[in-house]
Amino acid sequence: YSDFNLGTKVRHREDNDIWIAEWLNGSKGELNTWVAEDCDGIVSGLYEYDVAYRPEFADKLRFIPFPIDVKHAPLIADFAKVAFPPERPVRFFVGVQRSRSSYKGTDIMLRALRRLEAERPDEVQVVAVENLPFDEYKRAMLSCDVLLDQLYSYTPAMNALQAMAQGLVVVGGGEPESYDLLGCADIRPIINVLPDENDVYEKLRDLVDHKARIPQLSHESRLYTERYHDHLKVAQAYVDFWQSRKN
């Protein structure tokens, strides 16, 4: 599955159909192919990008994760030392961009979360914000325990990675293939969900049922970003790749 398909079924939406036409059959696709063929090296920052380019450009492709300034990403709490209070509800954060809600799967994730909130109002708090300035968005996000993000992704992207660096637990894309590409075998901090409302609901309910896990997942989320996404490590990987292609 992806932003554009579920198995062999294309996700027909107005903007999807336009992007497919432009990038597969139109001038943007032709330009992208020309650049890929002409350049000396290609960096893929996500599993999705890597699997798209590798069949045709494996000889010039290098996977380098997205960068996060982990050092300047303060933790929401030192959950390695503090247990999750059993009487406290779990606070879930959802950032809504109305124009991209269906594309990113926010509509489905929010419906699943609202179902759980209606059933267990004393155990679930939902913070849903729409089109906030970035500083306000960050403040709202950092008041929560869990971020819901990118239903159709195999991999956490920048919004999720920033949240993970600060100790939030992410519900979204965390398929085994993305961990394998990183060489990550010992931790699984992301609550991986399929693009299905019932699957999202079941995963959220399980997290609330076992909220004592949140401190460990929070700790692993920070560790994940430190290991694989630290901006200085990523910058050095770019330099090394550039040097290897230059020689």
Q: Which residue stretches match the model-derived regions?
A:
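Conserved donor-binding/catalytic core segment of Leloir-type glycosyltransferases
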Residues: 68, 72-75, 80-104, 110
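Short hydrophobic beta-strand element within catalytic cores of glycosyltransferases
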Residues: 169-176
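Acidic donor-binding loop of glycosyltransferase active sites
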Residues: 142-155, 168
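Membrane-proximal helix-turn-helix segments that form the acceptor-binding/catalytic region
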Residues: 12-42
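Short alpha-helical segment that forms part of, or immediately flanks, the ligand-binding pocket
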Residues: 138, 160-165, 179-180
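A charged, aromatic-enriched C-terminal amphipathic alpha-helix characteristic of glycosyltransferases
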Residues: 212-243
